[in-house]
Amino acid sequence: MLRVIIVDDEQPAREDLRERLNEEHGIEIVAECSNALEAIPAIQRLQPDVVFLDIQMPRINGLELASMLNPESMPHIVFVTAYDEYAIRAFEEHAFDYLLKPLDHQRLAKTLTRLSRDLIVKNNLHKVIKPILRHIPCSGHNRIFLLKIEEVEYLSSELSGVHVVGTVQSGYTQLSLKTLEEKTPFIRCHRQYMVNTEQLGEIQLMDNGAAEVITRSGKHIPVSRRYLKSLKEKLGIA
């Protein structure tokens, strides 16, 4: 699943790109931002795979925004603009691609294919070398502590951080859901939730196509339609 953030100060441009991306399989738009001040914390918090970024924006333009990101951890940047004179500067700022407005469907499709291939390579590499956490560093009630992986029931992304809900105690961690997805055996069941399958009691299916995970202790965790199929596959019940 390619996780995307759209950044453009023009609402019609965001809507056009959103509609085009929604026509493609394997893409999840995790956020839309109208300026750099909204985009920077969203990128840091959500850690998308790719940011489709306009260049001409007020106060902080797209090139300046890209230069503020850490090159070692930044997502792929695809600049989307009506001006071709920024191309050289864009690639100096580590651009993955540079698309001109109005968007050409075939050109966008080629970019998405390249992005998907790159994601597959990265995921395969992570499977080989990814370190697995044994504990999650948490804070709460004026103290810092470690929660064992096997004692965690589920994770939820909130404004104050990722809430780590355990069987005995709970807390908040500065690690992102994306990092925890890479470094723990937990399974994502929703854009904002991950579940420890060792603590899973049952899955209740709903008429609207969504579902709920119920942990052994009776806690209810939402499962979105987008993630239900992959959750069932990973549990061997597809």
UniProtKB/Swiss-Prot annotation:
Read off the SMART domains from this record: LytTR (SM00850), REC (SM00448)
Q: Which residues carry this modification: 4-aspartylphosphate?
A: 54
State the Gene Ontology terms under molecular function: phosphorelay response regulator activity; transcription cis-regulatory region binding
Highest taxon in the source lineage:
Bacteria
Report domain Response regulatory positions.
3-116
- Positions of the HTH LytTR-type domain: 136-237
GO terms of biological process kind? regulation of DNA-templated transcription
Name the source organism.
Yersinia pestis
PROSITE patterns linked: HTH_LYTTR (PS50930), RESPONSE_REGULATORY (PS50110)
Stated name of the protein: Uncharacterized response regulatory protein YPO3287/y0902/YP_0397
